[in-house]
Design a protein with these regions (language model features):
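Bacterial N-terminal signal peptides
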Residues: 5-15
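Active-site loop/oxyanion-hole signature of alpha/beta-hydrolase fold enzymes
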Residues: 22-25, 67-108, 112, 116, ...
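Conserved HGGG/HGGXW glycine-rich cap/lid loop of the alpha/beta-hydrolase fold
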Residues: 25, 31-78
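Conserved catalytic-core motifs of eukaryotic protein kinase domains, centered on the activation segment
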Residues: 51-53, 76-82, 143-144, 228-229
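Flexible "cap/lid" loop of the alpha/beta hydrolase fold
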Residues: 118-123, 127-159
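Conserved alpha/beta-hydrolase catalytic His-Asp/Glu region
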Residues: 142-145, 152-212
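Conserved loop-alpha-helix segment in the C-terminal half of the alpha/beta-hydrolase fold
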Residues: 214-253
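Post-His helix in hydrolase/transferase enzymes
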Residues: 253-268
Length: 272
């Protein structure tokens, strides 16, 4: 139960909860640690800031670490009209950055959090020192354009969500960790599951633009075909990628020490 010991340890490190605001919605975040670099950790679809429980204690020894709940997730407010978008998510992250009075930040995004941090870099390039994607696409041009998510409404929709989540595990994913992830993701409201999924289908995310800051993608061991480096570097010229063998989609939970070392090595090379 390694992940549980990490969660317990996280309470030893001083943390401060904050609430920023975007479009009248309260955006929850937690700040831990201090240091020359500020890392903002952005969770994935129907997840919340607890996704990063295995990162915060280790990274906060060296950096200021901010975990955020995106709109409609965790303890953050949801849009009353049910309209979610990558712009809304990116602006929520910016509200958190501004509230924290951080100048430049390193953004770490898991799964759906990867296109969120890319969109943030489009909207607020002067605020970004670097990007780290965790088993998620920074270049949505390479994301399957014909992807059709299953219906997510009603009891059958909940079953579909559970099936999607279980497909993210490997036989080596500890059962207690599987249950933790299932509980976290299935408690997200139906409107959030539908709206956040729809936000990833926006054709505007596939535009040919350049994001010049350093970027690292860390892929799960189950990712069978990594993005084409030459094509990706047309959009992200300072893009690098690596893979963590023996992991599923939640690789930062499954092999936290290895993942944390990759983060530190990347951040320590950045200019602030």
């Amino acid at each position: 139960m390694r992940w549980l010991s990490v969660v317990v340890l996280s309470f030893v490190v001083a943390a401060t909860a904050s609430a920023a605001s975007v479009d009248g919605l309260n955006i929850h975040s937690t700040t831990t640690g201090a240091g020359p670099a500020t890392l903002v950790l952005v969770h994935g679809w129907t997840c919340d800031e607890s996704s990063w429980a295995a990162q915060v204690p280790a990274l906060a020894k060296k950096y200021r670490v901010i975990t955020v709940d995106l709109p409609g997730h965790g303890r953050s407010g949801a849009p009353a009209n049910g309209k979610f978008s990558m712009d809304l998510f990116a602006r929520a992250v910016e509200a958190v950055r501004a509230e924290a009075r951080a100048d430049k930040i390193v953004l770490v995004g898991h799964s759906m959090g990867a296109p969120v941090i890319r969109q943030y870099a489009r909207l607020y390039p002067a605020r970004v020192a670097g990007l780290i994607a965790v088993d998620g696409p920074l270049d949505m041009r390479q994301f399957p354009g014909d992807f059709k998510p299953p219906a997510l409404t009603g009891p059958e929709g909940l079953k579909a969500r559970e099936g999607m989540i279980r497909s993210m595990f490997t036989p080596q994913t500890p059962p207690d960790l599987q249950q933790k992830i299932l509980t976290m993701m299935l408690k997200a409201p139906e409107a959030t599951a539908i709206g956040a999924m729809g936000s990833m289908m926006d054709p505007a995310l596939r535009k040919d633009d350049v994001t010049p800051m350093p970027a690292l993608a860390v892929w799960a061991g189950t990712s069978q075909q990594l993005p084409n480096l030459e094509d990706t570097r047309k959009a992200l010229p300072k893009y690098e990628q690596t893979q963590v063998p023996g992991t599923g989609h939640f690789l930062m939970m499954e092999k936290p020490d290895e993942f944390n070392r990759l983060v530190v090595a990347f951040v320590d090379k950045l200019q602030f």
